[in-house]
Structure formats: C-alpha cells, structure tokens
C-alpha cells in the first residue's frame, strides 16, 4: 500500500495537470475540449482507492458523441496521459476508460484510436510499459500489459466487423445516468441498437469466420488473469470484472455457434467441415482454460457466483467421431471443391442433364470409360434435327445409329479420326414438353443418316479392293504365270510417279526372268510353279555336257522298284548315284528287315534368285574334268550386261 507521501505527490501531479489543461485549452478557446481533457485527467487520477467515477465517464461519452472531431481529441488526450505516466494505476484507469468508451461511446472513437496509434501514440501498445511506483511492480505491470493486449484484440474485432454486439455498460448495470442534453447525437438512455444478425440467423461460413475471432478474443481475456499481489488489489478486481462480463457473452456466442455448426455438420462443404472441426478442437482446450479462469475469479471474489455461466466441455468421443467422419469423407473425390453430402450416396433421379454415369463398358479388348464424358452436368444431350442438319451442311457425316445400341455407350473412335458417340434410347430427353412430331423428325433424320453411312461403307470397300488389285508384287506375277509363253509385259502398269521410282526399281526379278528367257533360246525347258492347272508339267533338264553321275537318261531311271518323289502335282524320279567306294560285307551278315530311318530328298520350297540355276530346274554345266565351264558362264554374263541398260530403262520409265 503506498504511503501517504506517495498519495500526496500523486494528488499534486493530478492537480497540476488539470491546471495546465485549463490554461492551454483556455488560450485556444476552451469549451468542450477543456471540459473533455479535465474529465479525462480526473477519471485517471493517481488515487488507488478511488475508482473511475461513472459521472465523469458519462460526461466524456456525451462530449464525444456530440461531434466527430471530439472523438479524435479524446483519443489524443488519453494517448498523452498513458504515454507520460510510469504509474500502473494511471495506466490501468486509462485503459478501463478506453474500454468503457468502446462499449458505450461513439463508433468513431475506435477508428480515432487506431489512427492515433499509427501516428505513434501509446494507447494500446504498452509492451514497453513498466511500473516504477511499487516495490513489486511486475505483477501489476503484467496485468496492465495483458489488459492492453485484450483491448487491442477487441479493437481489431470491432473494426473488422467480427464483434457480435457492442457491450453497453448501461444494459449490464443500469447505474449510468446522464443529464438530458440536446447536443448528443443519440440518447444515451436508449442504448445503442445492433443491426447485426443474431447467432442463430448467421450462415455457416460467416459463423465460422466470426467464431475464429471470438476465440482469439477469449484467449486474450483469459490471459488477463492476475498473479501475485495483483490478485488482492481492488482496482485490479474492478478492471477484471469488466473483462469477465464480456467473456460471459463471448462464451455464449461461441457455444451457440458451435452447436449450430454441429447440427449442420454433415451438410456443410468439405472445407467448412474442416474449419468447424478445428474450431471444436480449439474450443475443447479453450473451455478447460476458461473454466480454470472462472474458478480463480470466483476464489478472489470477482462478481457474483450466479453470474458465471456453466461451462459445457466438448467430449473427446465427439471429437473422435468427427475426425473419423472427415477421414472417411476425405477418400471421396471432391467435385468442384464441394464436400459430398449424404444425399450424394443415394442414386440420382433419371435426368438428361444431371445423369452422371461412372461405369465402364467393355467392347471386346478395349474398355471405354464414360465417367469423363458425363462428368460435367448438362454436357450430354440427345441428337436433334437441327444438329443433324448442321452436320450435313458442314459436310461431316454422322455415325450410324441403331435402336439396339448399348445403353450409355461411350465415345467410339473411327479409323479416320472421327469421334462418334453412340446414341441410345436412354439418352433421349425425359421431358414431357418434347412433342411427338420432333421425335418422328429425329427418327427420319436418323434413317437418312444410316443409309448415307451404309453407302459410304460400300464405296470404301470397293476402294480397298481396287487398291489391293493395283498393288504389284513380282513374286505373285511369277507364280500366276500359268503359260510358259506368256510374257510378264502383258500385265498393265499404272503410270508411275516420282515417289514410286524407288519402289519400281526393286522389281529386279522381272529383269532376271527376261534375261533367263533370252539365254535359253531354243531350250525346251520352262519354269512352271508346282500345283497349277497342268497336272503333270514337263520337267526336262537336258544338257550337252558330260555328267559322270548320270550314266543313263533321266527317263529310264524311273523304274517300278525305285522310289518316286512327289511334290504338289509334280512327280520326280528319285535316283541314287553309284558310290565311289564299297564296304566288304561278310557272307554270314544278315541285314535287318526294316531300317531305323529313311532319308528322303528335299527340293527347294522357293525359287531363290540368288542361288544357282539348279534351284530353278537348270543343271550346272560341268567341264570334262569335273569343273565348271567358264565359257558358258562368261557368255551368260555378256548377255546380261548387254540387256542390263535396256531392262533398267524400261522399268524406270
């Protein structure tokens, strides 16, 4: 408790400040400004035993509400008072006065306080404040700082429109009365009516936004808990009681808001559900701290016990249930960021605009997913007569449509790149306004389109057949040659283009065949494929050279006991040359009745142009000493070189 000397010094300071204010304002005209500053100095005196006089508060409120400029003068005066003092009593009384003006004063005052703080006034920014008037200053200094932080948060809520109601001291105590004055812009006795909607009338999004600010403000209120010697101080208790009254209303608003959110929790958007769950988790911890704060306030005798609300704690089971529900719903694909409501699990009514099919149709080896096609509502509509006419005018053919098409068929890709959508009867609009005449026109247009599509298919098949016939293969030309005297030149050739020169240059087989025909001259040998119209074509390989392995003519080798080699329709006489050596077999040797294996001669399956003439039926020409006759080979090469340029020019032209 301060000594009498300190009380006297404080009284002298207060009187000196009042005299200086009167002199300074009297020189500039005085009037309401002098009265306002004197009332502020008297309300924030150094006397700890004297609380703020309600009559002075009412006078200050009346002056502020009479003129807008007076609100700025009041904020400047309070800023000078707090900035110059090092006494916790003066600082705390100044803060309580600010709170009273916030509750019952002109709405322009909070804005002027903010402007004054931006200009450097230390009204609510008391982070550097320190008490020098007490032997135990930290308890009181901490309370002043936390009280200033609460007012700063309250100012933020009010300026952003998040504060639910303006808490008027007249409605709570009813002790404030004022003399009737004509200068006031509103009647103080009537109070200030709030035009903001009640909590029960707010939408979930607005409610979640405001609950977040209310919880921050409630945290600041809980932080004003006094410690040490400040618990027993009367001025501290009176200041804390004003904060307690606002915390009662904050708790009720938060509880009512959370109850409304939980009632509509399963019908909210997904992000709103997450915000509501976070608010519930924060409220469960905050309500425990608030209950402890109220118990402390009751123990030190702040207010009446009947004024305190009953704190309803949020159960842990409820939080676990909400958390499990959010985990389950997080697995669902969010459509446009919306949370799927329980109604989304029910089958939607059949409609052409709202039908969303997420099934997959299996057509053979390919699977067509129709979920993407029907993901956007209203994107699927039936084909109308106007659409078909517009497509016909544009020159695009419509796909063939059938009443037997698969229901809800997906998109079908044409080999030419056209994307066709299969239309079914289930895709027709379920709208009674559609007349029967429109449906008949649609059916007629569908028939026309189907006929046109069928005609185009027939033309495509003809073109494909023609293209197959036009393709020229030298091997096919050789195999289809059933007449030995028929020449390949009889095959009609299309006029070749520059792009086909390289392809035509590869027809070397024609040149080889022509050369072989010229070399033969008068030979009666002819190359005939096996298995053609002639059942037994002539196969002769007569040569003038001596062959030591052929002692008899080929025709005489075909005896009844010798094996016959048959391939296709051609019968060849197998022969075995005499061996150059013999094995002496004992007389008592008896051969087995049946051999273990039997070797058969093989003939070439294909005519390889790179092999010798023997593969085509020619026999090699051997010399008398068993070597190849070089003269005949050189003769063939000369004939080839003579006709090479002529053949190449003929086929490249």
From Swiss-Prot:
Main location: membrane
Pfam families recorded: ANTH
Keyword Aminoacyl-tRNA synthetase: no
Cellular compartment(s): Membrane, Clathrin-coated pit; Golgi apparatus; Cytoplasmic vesicle, Clathrin-coated vesicle
Gene Ontology terms, MF aspect: 1-phosphatidylinositol binding; clathrin binding
Keywords noted in UniProt: Coated pit, Cytoplasmic vesicle, Endocytosis, Golgi apparatus, Membrane, Protein transport, Transport
Domain ENTH: 28-165
Motif (ALPHAC-AD binding): 608-610
Segments carrying motif Required to promote clathrin assembly: 442-444
Polar residues bias locations: 174-185, 416-432
SMART domains: ENTH
InterPro entries: ANTH_dom (IPR011417), ANTH_dom_sf (IPR014712), ANTH_N_plant (IPR048050), AP180-like (IPR045192), ENTH (IPR013809), ENTH_VHS (IPR008942)
GO annotation, biological process: clathrin coat assembly; clathrin-dependent endocytosis; protein transport
Chain spans, region Disordered: 170-190, 338-360, 390-432
Alphabetical list of Gene3D superfamilies matching this protein: 1.25.40.90, ANTH domain
GO cellular component: clathrin-coated pit; clathrin-coated vesicle; Golgi apparatus
Record's function text: Adaptins are components of the adapter complexes which link clathrin to receptors in coated vesicles. Clathrin-associated protein complexes are believed to interact with the cytoplasmic tails of membrane proteins, leading to their selection and concentration. Binding of AP180 to clathrin triskelia promotes their assembly into 70-90 nm coats cages.
Record text on subunit structure and interactions: Interacts with ALPHAC-AD and clathrin.
Protein name (Swiss-Prot/TrEMBL): Clathrin coat assembly protein AP180
Gene assigned in the entry: AP180
């Amino acid at each position: 408790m301060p000594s009498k000397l300190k009380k006297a010094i404080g009284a002298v300071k207060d009187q000196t400040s009042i005299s200086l204010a009167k002199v300074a304002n009297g020189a500039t005209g005085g009037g309401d400004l002098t009265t306002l500053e004197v009332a502020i100095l008297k309300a924030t005196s150094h006397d700890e035993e004297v609380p703020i006089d309600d009559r002075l508060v009412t006078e200050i409120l009346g002056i502020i509400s009479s003129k807008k400029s007076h609100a700025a003068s009041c904020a400047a005066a309070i800023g000078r008072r707090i900035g110059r003092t090092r006494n916790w009593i003066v600082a705390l009384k100044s803060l309580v006065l600010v709170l009273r003006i916030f509750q019952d004063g002109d709405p322009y005052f909070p804005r002027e306080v903010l402007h004054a703080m931006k200009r450097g006034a230390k009204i609510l920014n008391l982070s550097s404040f320190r008490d020098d008037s007490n032997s135990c200053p930290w308890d009181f200094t901490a309370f002043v700082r936390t009280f200033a932080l609460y007012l700063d948060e309250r100012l933020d809520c009010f300026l952003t429109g998040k504060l639910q109601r303006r808490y008027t001291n007249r409605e709570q105590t009813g002790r404030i009365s004022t003399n009737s004055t004509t200068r006031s812009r509103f009647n103080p006795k009537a109070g200030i009516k709030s035009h903001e909607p009640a909590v029960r009338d707010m939408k979930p999004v607005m409610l979640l936004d405001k609950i977040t600010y209310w919880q921050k403000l409630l945290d600041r209120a809980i932080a004003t808990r006094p410690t040490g010697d400040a618990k027993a101080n009367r001025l501290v208790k009176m200041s804390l009681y004003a904060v307690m009254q606002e915390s009662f209303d904050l708790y009720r608003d938060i509880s009512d808001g959370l109850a409304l959110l939980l009632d509509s929790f399963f019908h909210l958007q997904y992000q709103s559900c997450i915000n509501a769950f976070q608010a519930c988790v924060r409220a469960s911890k905050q309500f425990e701290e608030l209950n402890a704060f109220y118990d402390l306030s009751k123990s030190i005798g702040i207010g009446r016990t009947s004024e305190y609300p009953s704190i309803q704690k949020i159960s842990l089971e409820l939080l676990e249930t909400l958390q499990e529900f959010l985990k389950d719903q997080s697995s669902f694909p969010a459509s446009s960021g919306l949370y799927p409501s329980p109604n989304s699990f029910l089958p939607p009514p059949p409609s052409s605009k709202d039908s969303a099919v997420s099934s997959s149709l299996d057509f053979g080896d390919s699977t067509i997913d129709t979920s993407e096609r029907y993901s956007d509502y209203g994107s699927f509509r039936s084909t109308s007569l106007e659409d078909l006419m517009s497509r016909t005018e544009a020159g695009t053919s419509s796909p063939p449509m059938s009443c037997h098409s698969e229901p809800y068929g997906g998109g079908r890709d044409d080999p030419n790149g056209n994307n066709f959508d299969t239309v079914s009867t289930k895709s027709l609009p379920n709208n009674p306004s559609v007349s029967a005449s429109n449906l008949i026109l649609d059916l007629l247009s569908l028939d026309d389109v189907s006929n046109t599509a069928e005609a185009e298919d027939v033309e495509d098949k003809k073109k494909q057949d023609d293209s197959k016939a036009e393709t020229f293969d030298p091997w096919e030309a050789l195999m289809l040659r059933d007449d030995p005297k028929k020449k390949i030149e009889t095959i009609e050739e299309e006029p070749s283009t520059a792009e086909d020169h390289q392809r035509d240059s590869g027809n070397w087989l024609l040149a080889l065949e022509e050369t072989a025909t010229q070399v033969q001259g008068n030979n009666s040998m002819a190359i005939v494929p096996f298995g053609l119209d002639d059942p037994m074509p002539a196969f002769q390989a007569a040569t003038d050279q001596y062959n030591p392995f052929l002692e008899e003519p080929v025709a005489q080798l075909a005896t009844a006991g010798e094996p016959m080699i048959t391939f296709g329709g051609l019968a060849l006489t197998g022969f075995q040359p005499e061996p150059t050596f013999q094995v002496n077999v004992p007389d008592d040797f008896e051969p087995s009745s049946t051999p273990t294996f039997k070797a058969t001669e093989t003939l070439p399956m294909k005519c390889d142009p790179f092999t010798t003439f023997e593969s085509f039926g020619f026999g090699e020409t051997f010399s008398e000493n068993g070597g190849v006759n070089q003269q005949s080979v050189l003769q063939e090469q000369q004939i080839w070189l003579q006709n090479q340029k002529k053949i190449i020019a003929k086929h490249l032209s």
